[in-house]
From Swiss-Prot:
This is Allene oxide synthase 1, chloroplastic. (13S)-hydroperoxy-(9Z,11E,15Z)-octadecatrienoate binds at N337. Cytochrome P450 of the CYP74A subfamily involved in the biosynthesis of jasmonic acid from lipoxygenase-derived hydroperoxides of free fatty acids. Catalyzes the synthesis of unstable allene oxide, which is further converted spontaneously by hydrolysis or cyclization. Can use 13S-hydroperoxy-9(Z),11(E),15(Z)-octadecatrienoic acid (13-HPOT) and 13S-hydroperoxy-9(Z),11(E)-octadecadienoic acid (13-HPOD) as substrates. It comes from Solanum lycopersicum (Tomato). One of its GO terms (biological process) is jasmonic acid biosynthetic process. Residues 1-69 form a transit peptide.
Amino acid sequence: MASTSLSLPSLKLQFPSHTSSSSRKNSSSYRVSIRPIQASVSEIPPYISSPSQSPSSSSSPPVKQAKLPAQKVPGDYGLPLVGPWKDRLDYFYNQGKNEFFKSRIQKHQSTVFRTNMPPGPFISFNPNVVVLLDGKSFPVLFDVSKVEKKDLFTGTFMPSTDLTGGYRVLSYLDPSEPNHAKLKKLMFYLLSSRRNEVIPEFHNSYSELFETLENELSTKGKAGLNAANDQAAFNFLARSLYGINPQDTELGTDGPKLIGKWVLFQLHPLLILGLPKVLEDLVMHTFRLPPALVKKDYQRLYNFFYENSTSVLDEAEKIGISREEACHNLLFATCFNSFGGIKIFFPNMLKWIGRAGAKLHSQLAQEIRSVISSNSGKVTMAAMEKMPLMKSVVYESLRIEPPVASQYGRAKHDMVIESHDASFEIKEGELLYGYQPFATKDPKIFDRSEEFVADRFIGEEGEKLLKHVLWSNGSETENASINNKQCAGKDFVVLVSRLLLVELFLRYDSFEIEVGASPLGAAITLTSLRRASF
């Protein structure tokens, strides 16, 4: 999802071993019990602790680096209207995203250059950007002392606030704006107040997913993952964060479908849907779709969240946020950020693991089952910290195909940005853009950068590379706060991704897939699920 930031609270909290009975009152109708699960942890896991000291802090003196040659940022924007339109056609159709950037790197002999980013006219009238495509220049986009993030969540255009109840939600706020800190605090509160439920509810929701896939495999010989994952993801988020089973409400099973339509009206200028090129470019990339067409769908989602988030809305009023604004933000954080992240990342991660083959599957199954067995059969955060291969696989999946592909920032003042090869002067007000898959596959940082290396982040040397995993609008070794734009749900995303692998390989020895394309992430079809044999 383009420029998506998963705005849910960071898991910097201990998970108590007890479970609140009051939070389970709405969930009896969907409980699935296969094995005991306890949401507990003996200590705060290392992956959410403070960054370790860098190697440069050792006793040996630092090596003085040669001054990089100063260059003018290469490239241009072309003629008004014509240049942005031509770049848009190249980006979507003539070249595609990766070739669009690769060809310009080759043309300019630089990973920093000027171009136009979609959608351009007549949705965005100022699509001019300076592109950053290497791991050295890219991190400036996270430095809020140097760049402003106001209204840049989706890039060179901002969807109508009619799609979010008339409010600019948290993802579009710069940390300098007063409501940013208040709303981010509210997101932290959301998860901390429901921390007991995350691991058990993930188990329940994804056990239902696996049963659905098994039934479809047995009757049809193959099973589509994406739609089933969408339903499981929405059920999990509603149950764990709001204590409600959607199927017991007026919403029923419509949540994912309603979210899909609503997200389409926000992101259509950035998507390819497979329509005839001329028609798609005219309808999807040239003019905005009217928000009124999804008003009723959005109202159904809003009603669901308003009715089932009383305690969080009470907290919002204490912080100084109206219940209405808070609810629109909760909806956005849950449906766009969190649901959208799971929708994209889970299929992408399974694509890479599926392609890696049975040997990796066996190694993961052995590691996961051994640790859980020694932990009395309980899945806990502390237990997952003892699974180095599983953790590395999650980080490698986030590195090689980050769910957040794009980042933007507007220069707050004149500055100098450095790539590996040169330095460039940037003027105040210029819009900076980074395409993250290039930064996280920088061959000057990662060996075999284009390959999926499952054990890349194991051991001391592997852990040093985590600072270059950037999917969360910040480094993996840094933490979200009210003062930055790093994804408030960074650790939540890592946790649920780990849980998916644990649940999968506790249940199955291996799986086989077919991979197709979709507007958001990979389309996965399962052709085989081999039940656990040991």
